[in-house]
Amino acid sequence: MKANIVTLPGDYIGPEIITQAVKVLQAVAEKYGHEFSFDERKLGGASIDAFGVPLTDETLAACNAADAVLMGSVGGPKWDAVEPARRPEKGLLALRKGMQVFANLRPCTIHPQLAGACPLRPDLISKPIDIMILRELTGDIYFGKRWRSEDRAAATDEMAYSVPEVERLARIGFEMAKKRRGKLCSVDKANVLECSRLWRETIERMSREYPEVEVSYMYVDNAAMQLILNPAQFDVMITGNLFGDILSDESAAIAGSLGMMPSASLGSTTRGLYEPIHGSAPDIAGRDIANPLGTILSGTLLLRHSLGLEAEAAAIEKAVSQVLDEGYRTGDIFSEGCIKVGCTQMGDLVAKRVLS
């Protein structure tokens, strides 16, 4: 297979972790006979420094012409004084909008080798945990109308969803549940919010098309509690932008380290945007100590969802597991008795296991 992948290293540790993810994808291409080309572009602060804007039209066009986009991280204190409309994070929002992605996938798994890093009691994670949180990206209160009174003493943010917005996300959720363990939990606040009542009604109607999927409903406050008390009960969780933002970060804490967590943003085509969920970590940038595994695992989502290469994705996941089995750890997941390695060495280790 030939594939064109745009890389957006971004800021601070972004270039370091992207380099390792590309290294591993190149190992996959070598082993399985694929031809991956990588087109590196600037995003966020790096783009501001070079072009004066966080995302150029040329970069967006390149992303939309690619088979997939792999991103590092954007933002940091260097650009704190930049006017809000040109901040690095605005580049990411514009990229998501320009690529027309609307579904954010956040896997939550606990690697057995890192169970000690999970803050939950051992009995709460005794069963395998494999959750996929599906968050809507383009609607909800983040994109609703905003108002602030002239005296700055009152403010309003509008929460809004339409049936088509919920339907297109739900379709992805149901199809994903069919391929996984056949369970979908829809999270809302339908006892209070009209927006959530529309959400639940839409999920209920669509569930009739998927009789093989077991559907459940939870209010968001209960879902937040159940993620702690019994995370193994969940398979696919589907929710809106605001609730998903909060729950997906909670799930990252369960996994033990932000550095291990990948994500994908998908639309109605196979082209997707893939990135780790952690930030740009300016405090450790340039020291070759960042954890690249979240970015490397984002590459598995890229292979699986954009290129349809399931065996290749599984090969990377197996390689990561082997490296962890052998005791190698970056500083954020290090514990006594393990072998501490840097960002580059971790990438080398995973790539070598892919090729073996």
Where are the predicted features?
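Glycine-rich phosphate/nucleotide-binding loop
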Residues: 45-48, 227-328
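Buried hydrophobic positions in well-ordered alpha/beta secondary-structure cores of metabolic enzymes
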Residues: 11-14, 67, 134, 173, ...
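N-terminal beta-loop-helix "entrance" segment that forms/cooperates
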Residues: 33-57, 225-227
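Extreme N-terminal starter segment of soluble prokaryotic enzymes
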Residues: 1-5
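N-terminal glycine-rich phosphate/adenylate-binding segment common to multiple enzyme folds
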Residues: 49-156, 242-244
